[in-house]
Structures are given as C-alpha cells and as structure tokens.
UniProtKB/Swiss-Prot annotation:
Its cofactor is Zn(2+). This is Metallo-beta-lactamase VIM-7. Changing D117A: Prevents coordination with a zinc ion and probably abolishes catalytic activity. Reduces thermal stability, but retains structural integrity. Its main location: periplasm. GO terms for cellular component: periplasmic space. The class B beta-lactamase family has a specific amino-acid numbering system known as BBL, for standard numbering of class B beta-lactamases. A multiple sequence alignment was used to derive a consensus sequence and then the consensus was numbered taking into account insertions and deletions. This allows use of identical numbers, e.g. for active site residues, despite differences in protein length. UniProt always uses natural numbering of residues, hence there appear to be differences in numbering between this entry and some papers. Belongs to the metallo-beta-lactamase superfamily. Class-B beta-lactamase family. It is found in: Periplasm. Changing H200Y: Increases catalytic efficiency about 5-fold, with respect to benzylpenicillin and ampicillin. Increases catalytic efficiency about 10-fold, with respect to various cephalosporin antibiotics, excluding cefuroxime. GO terms for biological process: antibiotic catabolic process; response to antibiotic. The gene is VIM-7. Class B beta-lactamase which confers resistance to the beta-lactam antibiotics, including penicillins, cephalosporins and carbapenems. Acts via hydrolysis of the beta-lactam ring. Has penicillin-, cephalosporin- and carbapenem-hydrolyzing activities. Zn(2+) 2 binds at D117, C197, H239.
C-alpha cells in the first residue's frame, strides 16, 4: 500500500446546476476514489502531494462504467492540467471542482494521447481560456480519429526518447505502448509519475483496449520509463488505483501475457 493524503472534495458540495446538481460527500478514510464512488458526470479530486492532485472521473461504455485519472499540478499561482476528464460534461465538472476546492486558474493543459479519455473536453478547456498542448503526433492522430484536437504542439516531443520541461513537470515520450503517441508526465518536486494509459493498475489482468496499441514495443517503452524515473515514489495509471514503481513491471507482465494468450487459446 502506498501512502498519499487525500484532498477532501467537500462536506456537502454540489455539482453545478447545469450538470444536474447532485450532492456528494467527502471520501471516507482518505481512500482513493473508485468507479463505485463517482457517478458519471461528477469528478473527484485527490491530493497526492504538495501542489499535486489527481482528478478522477467516470464514463459509461456499453453496460460498463470505467474510471479515468488525470493530474493537476500547481505552477506558482496557476494550475497545469494533465488530461481532460473524458468528455465535455465531465470536463465542465472538473473545472468547477478545481475552482471550488483549489481556487486557482487552470491556464495550460497537456493531453497524453489522442483517445477521448485524454482529449474529450479540450474544446471546453479552450472556451475557458486554457491553452491546450500535446505532441505533434497526438494532434495528428486526434484529428484523423475525429476527436477534439489540442491547439498547440510540443514540437520537441517528436521522436521516441524525447523529453521537454514544461513548467513544474517533465514530459517524456517513451515510445509506443497503449497507443503510438502516449506521453508520461513526471513531477520531480514530489516524485510523482503520471503514466497515463501506458501503465496499468495492480489489479489489471488484461491489456484492455489494444486497438491502437503496439504490443511488441510496449515492454521496451516501459523499460525506458523505468530507466528514466527510478526515483518515482507514486505512479498513477490512466485508469484505477495509483501505486509505486511495481506498476511498471506489472504492466510489462500483463502485456507479455496478452501477447501469448491467442496462441494458448
């Protein structure tokens, strides 16, 4: 079990009227919010460390509800947002929660790959005055997929192994994994690594949605992350519960198992 302090999202907070005005209570016992705790259309914040929060939202696909993680990082008197909250409605709720619970403006965002759980809501951010960033490849893939497209390219993130400092974080393009364009974000001040969908939670036994994955390259990509951030203390996956560096090896194991599963079947 990793130890991180929770950011209580309010004793009797309400989602904005436009979102349905549903009440929710603070997370008991400092537990990380799960899919069972968050109705679709609402967002929870969880404090990871000084000036760093995860944001957690849910979305229903078919008959199943999934949770999704993003990150909020303080940058002086502003906030940097890592990933949307998976859709316009959720992202409106996210901005409302940030205003309510943190009270600082979100001025910039980074999307870590082109899927809707990372870029869905970019138009909401843009309308709110947030400068939206991602890699050149993510912009290209998002446009090709008909997804929302962040406005600005981090042109230094063009090839596997590229890294750029962006305010209080380091953004690393480790190579193809869950998607060809997935980025990871490291907050050195608190040793928090946001692995996004390149990294799985500990309970995950399947590689999940691999429609755009590169299963052959994924283990090597994880190895690059391990080599670059051996000092990371908290690792946040794209979906599910945070952990430590063990999540990286776990992800490799899951991906390798997925690769051989069709042969066994």
């Amino acid at each position: 079990m990793f130890q991180i302090r929770s950011f209580l999202v309010g004793i009797s907070a309400f989602v904005m009227a436009v979102l349905g005005s549903a009440a929710y209570s603070a997370q008991p016992g400092g537990e990380y919010p799960t899919v069972d705790d968050i109705p679709v259309g609402e967002v929870r914040l969880y404090k990871i460390g000084d000036g760093v929060w995860s944001h957690i939202a849910t979305q229903k696909l078919g008959d199943t509800v999934y949770s999704s993680n993003g990150l909020i990082v303080r940058d002086a008197d502003e906030l940097l947002l890592i990933d949307t909250a998976w859709g316009a409605k959720n992202t409106v709720a996210l901005l409302a929660e940030i205003e309510k619970q943190i009270g600082l403006p979100v001025t910039r965002s980074i999307s870590t790959h082109f899927h809707d759980d990372r870029v869905g809501g970019v138009d909401v951010l843009r309308a709110a005055g947030v400068a939206t960033y991602t890699s050149p490849l993510t912009r290209q893939l998002a446009e090709a997929a008909g997804n929302e497209v962040p406005a600005h390219s981090l042109k230094a993130l063009s090839s596997s192994g590229d890294v750029v400092r962006f305010g209080p974080v380091e953004v690393f393009y480790p190579g193809a994994a869950h998607s060809g364009d997935n980025l990871v974000v490291y907050v050195p001040a608190v040793r928090v690594l946001f692995g996004g969908c390149a990294v799985h939670e500990a309970s995950r036994e399947s590689a999940g949605n691999v429609a755009d994955a590169n299963l052959a390259e994924w283990p090597a990509t994880i190895k690059r992350i391990q080599q670059r951030y051996p000092e990371a203390e908290v690792v946040i996956p794209g979906h599910g519960l945070p952990g430590g560096l063990e999540l990286l090896q776990h992800t490799t194991n899951v991906v390798k198992t997925h690769k051989v599963r069709p042969v066994a079947e």
